[in-house]
């Protein structure tokens, strides 16, 4: 049975939504639910916990990570604490910083350390896995296309 390390969006579970769909397709899931006690931790502690788990249990070329929305944000912060992840990574609708309400006609949001990922990418200091892809819908208001395209160009991650 193939195993996937899953990081769902904020408030996400491994047994619902994307996690449930992957389990229904025969995948074994590990990862972090982004709710409960884990969600209450400061971002640096969340990123450290994820980095430690990946290095201890998923550190090989055959490993697979799927990170969705805020889970992708957590993965990228964890990635900044370790060498390039050796496996395959799929980032779905990744949050990579703040989104302002005026540009989208909806309420905006700003995750903790909202500008850090783009700042590291612009400096060429953001470590990314060799096998990483970003997939996002054209109308996903939480992932502005122009920012993701810039992020992809800066990091070499296909969008």
Roles of regions detected by a PLM:
Residues 107-125:
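Active-site nucleophile elbow and catalytic-triad environment of alpha/beta-hydrolase enzymes
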Residues 14-16, 141-147:
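Conserved alpha/beta-hydrolase "acid-adjacent" motif
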